[in-house]
Amino acid sequence: MELPASFVDYTRSLLGEEEYEKLAVALQQEPPVSIRFNNEKWKMQDEGLSAVHSPFDRVPWSSEGVYLDERLTFTFDPLFHAGCFYVQEASSMFVEQALRQYIKEPAIMLDLCAAPGGKSTHARSVLPAGSLLVANEVIRNRSQILAENLTKWGHPGVVVTNNDPADFADLEGFFDVILTDVPCSGEGMFRKDPVAVSEWSPENVEICWQRQRRIISDIWPSLKPGGLLIYSTCTYNTQEDEENIRWMRDEFGAEILPVDAPAAWNITGNLLAGEDFPVYRFLPHRTKGEGFFLAVLRKPEGETVRIRYKSTV
């Protein structure tokens, strides 16, 4: 894989020479394969693991996630089609930690950019009983895939929608939790998807961080005061990650919350110079996964303020 020169220069300056060289080596390796069991259908602790993978490595931050030694032909597996497990990138399973730590009572949750359904099926598995998940996808054909995967998963407390983020603004203060896995430049997908490499450019990064702020501005009014916004991307740069978190803190008065993460997990923290608020970045040379980024923000208590971000995108 030949990485874009601008990406190399920026990421080397962000991580430092030694860390960048380790990342570059990792990006030339095969990505790990991981699945997450549906314990309502096929319990990981019972026959599931011995049937699909032995010996196995657990995904440390997921109660039902495991790594496989190789990528299987999942489309030929009736258990896959029955919703007994979901093929999901391991680092994105870290969403579970935020939900388990902060959501203790039944909640109404919106997964805003939900297709194909990995995080939605996962969230539905760990939300308290009595919760409702609204899984949304703006692209129509992808929303149909989302609906199919959630149907296979089998939990009844789910609604699938096909709306633009701005459509939710009138549901003022409606959601307890919003997960925004926003469209990004996809740097964390480089070793899984050659198209992500060919489509990357500094200009696309610029478009992405502006689009991300527009999405957050559109959806912010529908979050309850005191509610949680979980922000995630699959990219490394600070423009789409830390700088957007800082912007939400300064623009909306959001509180940036910590998520419990043992040092043994080797999750990388804040890379933005002069800032130390908690964020969680998975770098493939340090953790067994791809380039996932996550931060958790709490909306301040009090009156909902409508804010519209003006961008050129």
Language-model-detected regions and their locations in the chain:
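S-adenosylmethionine
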Residues: M1-V313
